[in-house]
Amino acid sequence: MAAECGSDSQPRRRRRRDPEEPGKTELSAREPVVAVPQENEEENEERWVGPLPVEATLAKKRKVLEFEKVYLDNLPSASMYERSYMHRDVITHVVCTKTDFIITASHDGHVKFWKKIEEGIEFVKHFRSHLGVIESIAVSSEGALFCSVGDDKAMKVFDVVNFDMINMLKLGYFPGQCEWIYCPGDAISSVAASEKSTGKIFIYDGRGDNQPLHIFDKLHTSPLTQIRLNPVYKAVVSSDKSGMIEYWTGPPYEYKFPKNVNWEYKTDTDLYEFAKCKAYPTSICFSPDGKKLATIGSDRKVRIFRFLTGKLMRVFDESLSMFTELQQMRQQLPDMEFGRRMAVERELEKVDAVRLINIVFDETGHFVLYGTMLGIKVINVETNRCVRILGKQENIRVMQLALFQGIAKKHRAATTIEMKASENPVLQNIQADPTIVCTSFKKNRFYMFTKREPEDTKSADSDRDVFNEKPSKEEVMAATQAEGPKRVSDSAIIHTSMGDIHIKLFPVECPKTVENFCVHSRNGYYNGHTFHRIIKGFMIQTGDPTGTGMGGESIWGGEFEDEFHSTLRHDRPYTLSMANAGSNTNGSQFFITVVPTPWLDNKHTVFGRVTKGMEVVQRISNVKVNPKTDKPYEDVSIINITVK
């Protein structure tokens, strides 16, 4: 976990749009050491009278998972995502099937099918599945059928392998959750759907008509939050908002309580844990052997149960208070970045998006993966340790995960022993490509983490964010209206009270940022502004009409979004960049660096470079300032800015 050391020049809370200063990073490994009493080595004939003295304790031997390295080699390891693809609207759901398909669903009711290939994925088909919001999606245990339910009171059923819609059910109520509850070999392809406002569960034939085969009307008394099939033991687990968890079966066993579990009364289990904590499961999944049941609760705790006994096996606390305490004990992120991520977490709770966060097992059942504010955590369930965090430095809040492991099946001749033993380089190149496909909060993209880091991110030709969607009519109209007379330029001169600074601008890479700067400059907005924050050996900052570091706005009023470009980095001194108070909060303030500041990449928009007048920038950076506020004792101001 990254930590950034502060300094006297670290941004203070009262300032809104200050760039962060350099820091250090280190990995934290907080692990509880469990002590056990040491046995007495000597037995004295004389007994102690009264209480015994405190005995020494020995550290308990750490558990080790055999072949852990082999298992981890079959999981994604890259710290940054390799590729991302688009929908028109925010992506809310993603699943991966055993038939090597990845299916994504967005808020506007659209569903896309993607095929996993030897390296990466390829687009297959696009469906307008629902007229409204998609509430839930599910894929069958063998990967043959897929269904989705939406607030248009309909269920759509798809044949995954042939990527075709094969059935449509009119439900007559607003659905909440759905799940395929049949196993391979069953006569009926049964699917369960819950009513969003009640605890009712309706069972249908996925290939049949609208008439339910069975209705559970007394199993749950509150709206359901999850329905999941355990295909190994042919049992279904459902949960509701009151924290109750129920086991039941499908049509082959007449919808009764499963007989293959090792308990009869729920009081013999730990399944009341959620009700005790006044929480409920927002995600449920099973290990490949069916023996472990992993959940994420509304209280942000990860609980892992033994399925057959219902006993609690592990609890991992991922609550905001835990992260705050961790940050105070040992800094995990720079203060500004930590504050930004905490704000995102609170917004998650405010809009009830926590229910979309899920948890998945790997193919061995020894590891669970889920998204947190620090990135995707990979937890070893056997040793109780976090072995890997993916995407910690990315500017996304990971929500739903789907994990692909193994080698994508391709229509080719079967591999023979002779082919395996041969030294054919083409055959040897066929390797596993473990991939995590994940959605992000308020993003219309899904992201792919693999074992490969992004290709040269400084090359403009290798953009990892694929633009696979055409712009909407509104975006085209906005772009057309914005053209009009030329409002931007590629150079300008900042006339200051200590001399002139010539700058080159990048209107192609950062059109909105350069337009904001040029229009403000032409309108005389920056005239008389002081350099209100100067840090020797770091940067000079200006553009605030109030001179406090808390003012300023864009030419459109308010704030506008970041414009990061792979070729524009803080990799050299005299870089012109936007100051902000977090992601997408650009106004009018900007700064010029006097040293390379790579830690500001992808946090502040670079939109220009100084081409002449570097000595003026250096003189300004060396003026005497108040050590507490970084404000110069004698004002250094902008006279005006000439845009060429």
Curated annotation (Swiss-Prot):
WD repeats: 86-124, 129-168, 219-258, 276-317
The keyword Hydrolase is annotated on this UniProt entry: no
Coiled coil ranges: none
SMART domains, sorted: WD40
Keyword line: Acetylation, Isomerase, mRNA processing, mRNA splicing, Nucleus, Repeat, Rotamase, Spliceosome, WD repeat
PROSITE patterns: CSA_PPIASE_2, WD_REPEATS_2, WD_REPEATS_REGION
Biological process annotations from GO: mRNA processing; protein folding; RNA splicing
Record-given protein name: Peptidylprolyl isomerase domain and WD repeat-containing protein 1
Upper classification of the organism: Eukaryota, Metazoa, Chordata, Craniata, Vertebrata
Gene symbol of the encoding locus: PPWD1
